[in-house]
Structures are given as C-alpha cells and as structure tokens.
Amino acid sequence: MTMLFEPFEFSGMRLKNRIVSVPVVSNLATEDGFVTDSLVERYRKIAEGGAAWIIIEDVVVISRKSPFNLRIWDDQFIPGLRKLTDTVHDVEGVKIGIQLGHFLKISMKGYRQRVEDLTLEEIKQIIEDHLQAALRSKKAGFDSIEWDAESCMTLSQFLSRQNKRKDEYGGSLENRLRIVMEIYQVTREALGKEFVLGVRINGDDLVMGGNTLLHSTEIAKRLAEAEVDYLSISCGGQWEDALPPKAGEPPSAYTGYSGLRCWPRAWDPDGANVYLSDGIRKAVRKAGYSVPVITSGKIPMPDLAEEILREGKADLIGLGRPLLCDPDWVRKALEGREEEIVRCIYCNHCSEVNDLFQTTDCIQWPKCSVNAPSPYLPKHKVSIEMEGLHEKERV
C-alpha cells in the first residue's frame, strides 16, 4: 500500500501519510463551547493511531446558542484550544487543522433563517467573524484552517443555486461565491501565504434546485484559481428535504435523502461519494490547477483507500466514522494488521446521537464509553436490524 503511506507535501505542510481525520462533531465540548479533557483525549487517540492530519470538528465562529459545539468567537476559548493543539503536536509528525463554521437561526417551532433574510451589514459581520476566528486559530496553534461551506452551513447556502438574493451576494455563480472569496482574501492577507487555508464544499447538494457536480466543479475551479491550498469534498445535508423533527427533538438537516447521502449507510456501496472528488479533481486538473483534493464517504478499509489514490480520484483520504470507531485504523493498516481493524459498520448511530446533541460515540464501543477503548480489537460482531435496532452479539 505504497501510496497511502507515502509522505505528501503541499503549501509548505508535510504530511507523513495521506490519511486525514476529517471533521466529526463530538459534542464533547462544554455547553458553552470550551475544550474538555474527554475531547482532548479523543483527538490524542487519533493522533497516536497514525493519522497524518487531523481537522477538528466544526468550531463555531459566533456566540449563537448550539449546545456542546466547540467555540472560537472570543479569546477566552484560545487556552483550551491551545491545550488541544499542543497535545496533538506532542505526537511526532501529526498536523492539526480547524474547521470554522457558521450557521443561521433555526427554531424548534420550524422557523429557519435563510441567506435571503440577511442584511448587507449582517453579511459583513459574518466575514469579520470568520476573520477573527482565523486569527484566534493561529494563536491557538493550528496548522491549517478550513471553512465549512458544505451541507446546511451558512456558506454552503450562499453557494447554492437556491440562493435567490438580488444583490452582489446572490444569483450568478460569481455573486454566490463572493462571501467565501471575501473571507478567504481577508484571511490570506492577515495570515500570509505560508498558512494553509482550505474549503470544504459539496460535490452535489442532492436536492432539487441545488448545486450538482457540474456546478460544483465550477466552484472548485474558481477556488483553485484564487489559490486556496486544498479542497475537501462532501455532499448533501440540506434543509430542503429534511423531515420535520419529532416532538421534543431538535430539527436536523440530515434526515432527508440528501442527509442520508452525506453520511452513507450500510446499504450504500463502499466509496459511495468518491465519484464527486474524482469529478472535481479531474476538472481542476484539466483547468491547470494542482490543488489537492480530499475525498471521504464510506471508505471502510485500507485497500479501497489505496485504490482511490492509485486511480487518481483524490490526493488525500478523509476518514471520519472509521477513525471514530477505531482510532488505531491507520497504525494497524501500516503494520499489516488489517484484520485487527474494528471496521465501521455504517449503522450511523453516531450520526443519530449527534443530531440530538448527545455525545457522538460508536455502538461498537463498550457501553457508556466516551472514547474508544485501548487496546481495541474486534471481539464482537454487530447485527443491524432494518428497523434501526442495534444489538451486539458475542462470537
């Protein structure tokens, strides 16, 4: 598996292999958004498990309430985040990035703010919030910054063809891209060319009237032309096809078809979303750009990851749920112990509890565990009933 474990260098950042821990919200922060020991422990395990680059979960750039999400809207959050980056950097050769996110207002009663509702003053504040968060990220010791412009997040809603604003922030592709470009430009000016800046976008919104792969390749080419350092590809996760929440539960953008495709399930084919990174990578290469592309979406085992790289469908392999399930996935693969990998079964228990703002855990861990056990070997199998019931069975 030569390519998977080859070093990879771009924009002055050297990775010891091509495996990236992509953002999965843990809900291990305090209710006010501060780093906890359990959260640090989760990322320490992933770092020690061999991933070259950890991009931590969506860190919110505004003070708007959202329980147990990490925050960075004020300097008071820097010390905790510094503790996290120092812990990861203690593991030789591991880089740590931060994903910055912004969301619009939504209520339990069904109200959902849209980008069309925002004033120009509010848009300028969103740009400023992202800039200040980026400055704090550098102070906290992160090696890279990623803007969350996928799924249901604010920047994704601006990029979508469903953005019907009548001013310079809506309508045409250039206008829909404007807020992302302005955030990138002011941040690049503030942090310099040496700091790694990337964007995570949808390859396909998977809803009527949203962006398709055709539109996303054009977005990717514009971002590559602007010299972003990397692109990370996701899909779906839109409000437009989300189901109404059950009584007493918070609304979620991941309950409709687009949400199910954002987190491919057990019945989806392995590598279900890789065609999106493949299409985008081919398009940006054809346009003359060499920007690295991260793929993700149901890549359970090393052999598929290696195949994706060898076939040129991505430059880096993003793992979310597999590293949540087994943080030692990379080390076991590197040492030829693939049979010891505790394989993610894609039951999406983690996604379901995440939607309820509960601690994101794995059904294969011992009961009541906050993080994966260590050492961790596959001692049981897990059966999945189609009704959504999960049951451990000893072998």
Where are these regions (language model features)?
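Flavin-dependent oxidoreductase catalytic cores
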Residues: 1-395
